[in-house]
Amino acid sequence: MTTTETQNPTARATAKHVRVTPMKARRVVDLVRGKRVEDALAILKFAPQAASEPVAKVVASAAANAENNLGLDPATLVISTAYVDEGATLKRFQPRAQGRAFRIRKRTSHITIEVESVPTAGGTRGRRKGGAK
């Protein structure tokens, strides 16, 4: 027995070599995974982490790609996939006492956000069937 899944249209945006460590960027990406794009941008606007700005840029870019390239309605977009990969590491030296040098690793990230259009049920979101009790 085979099942046929209807694939929702998806759009993707990627930011490469962003100067933020992948560990810190993953904390921010975990906040918005699975959320609606409007809600995710509101969350990222008030998030105190420095990585929230580049993540918000990628989310907005993915939404714009969905709207302009695929003609999707921005109100129906949900972040379906969001992940952060490790980019190239810039290696620097910090001079220390007595002629020593310590290595400083300036890490970069590749942030990928994928949004898909999920049709909303006709206005029944969050409502009860019965009246007030």
From Swiss-Prot:
Keywords: Ribonucleoprotein, Ribosomal protein, RNA-binding, rRNA-binding
UniProt cross-references to InterPro entries, sorted A to Z: Ribosomal_uL22, Ribosomal_uL22_bac/chlpt-type, Ribosomal_uL22_bac/org-type, Ribosomal_uL22_CS, Ribosomal_uL22_sf
GO cellular component: a single term: cytosolic large ribosomal subunit
Superkingdom of origin organism: Bacteria
GO BP term (any one): translation
A Pfam cross-reference name: Ribosomal_L22
GO molecular function: rRNA binding; structural constituent of ribosome
Keyword rRNA-binding carried by entry: yes
Known function: This protein binds specifically to 23S rRNA; its binding is stimulated by other ribosomal proteins, e.g. L4, L17, and L20. It is important during the early stages of 50S assembly. It makes multiple contacts with different domains of the 23S rRNA in the assembled 50S subunit and ribosome.
NCBIfam families noted in UniProt: rplV_bact (TIGR01044)
Family: Belongs to the universal ribosomal protein uL22 family.
Summary of subunit composition and partner proteins: Part of the 50S ribosomal subunit.
Protein name in UniProt: Large ribosomal subunit protein uL22
Annotated organism of origin: Nocardia farcinica (strain IFM 10152)
